[in-house]
């Protein structure tokens, strides 16, 4: 039994500063939704394509300017939207993104680029139905990065992450939900799961074409909340 959300699917973006637990939540949430019968596409930005690979290399070396990073991010995102995000949404699937355009606004905005211009440059990108913002104090995020054995890159300084956190907090986007990421991973998953179930329930309430099977699938999803 699956949940069909055509037309439009459901786009979930998971955002937050480095060390907030975005990748952990994205994977756990995708697994939980799939087990409940949802069709899920899990992806990330930057992608593993040529532009995304170049961006990750830049993050490690710090050799690109903020504007050069924006140019690569936009190329990567356009390819991502056209090849994966838009087709999956058209099929009525749930798309979960580990970072999306709000990260560009926060990180390149923290580097001094105008926030309005960064948002406008992403007008082509579908807006997320749900923006799950994992909020975390930067010292905690940096401690987590070191605990997993990674060396912080040039983005991952306390001052820069403070600026990024402030921009994330100030972003006014529909579907934004702030989640306390200082809690343990299970607690964060419970918070995110509740938000997603509520969004799916709203979609079924306003739709007139949903089948009994879809409603039963939603009940299964609701019952499958993490312990």
Curated annotation (Swiss-Prot):
Entry GO MF terms: ATP binding; dTMP kinase activity
Cellular component annotations (GO), alphabetically ordered: cytoplasm; cytosol
Catalysed transformations (reactions): dTMP + ATP = dTDP + ADP
GO biological process: dTDP biosynthetic process; dTTP biosynthetic process; dUDP biosynthetic process
InterPro entries to which the protein is assigned, alphabetical: P-loop_NTPase, Thymidylate_kin-like_dom, Thymidylate_kinase
Keyword ATP-binding: yes
Record's protein name: Thymidylate kinase
Biological classification of the source: Bacteria, Pseudomonadati, Pseudomonadota, Gammaproteobacteria, Lysobacterales
Gene that produces this protein: tmk
């Amino acid at each position: 039994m699956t949940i069909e959300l055509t037309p439009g699917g459901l786009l979930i973006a998971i955002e937050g500063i480095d060390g907030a637990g975005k990748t952990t939540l994205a994977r756990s949430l995708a697994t939980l939704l799939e087990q409940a019968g949802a069709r899920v596409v899990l992806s990330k930005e930057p992608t593993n394509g040529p532009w995304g690979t170049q961006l990750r290399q830049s993050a490690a070396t710090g050799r690109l300017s903020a504007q050069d990073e924006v140019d690569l991010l936009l190329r990567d995102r356009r390819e991502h939207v056209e090849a994966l995000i838009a087709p999956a949404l058209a099929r009525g699937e749930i798309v979960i993104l580990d970072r999306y355009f709000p990260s560009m606004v926060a990180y390149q905005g923290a580097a001094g680029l105008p926030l309005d211009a960064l948002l406008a440059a992403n007008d082509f990108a579908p807006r997320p139905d749900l923006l799950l913002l994992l909020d975390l104090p930067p010292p905690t995020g940096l401690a987590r990065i070191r605990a997993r054995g990674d060396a912080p890159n040039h983005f991952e300084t306390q001052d820069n992450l403070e600026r990024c956190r402030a921009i994330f907090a100030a972003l006014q986007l529909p579907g934004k939900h702030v989640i306390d990421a200082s809690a343990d991973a299970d607690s964060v998953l419970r918070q995110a799961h509740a938000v997603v179930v509520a969004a799916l329930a709203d979609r079924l309430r306003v739709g007139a074409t949903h089948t009994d099977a879809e409603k039963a699938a939603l009940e299964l999803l609701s019952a499958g909340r993490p312990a």
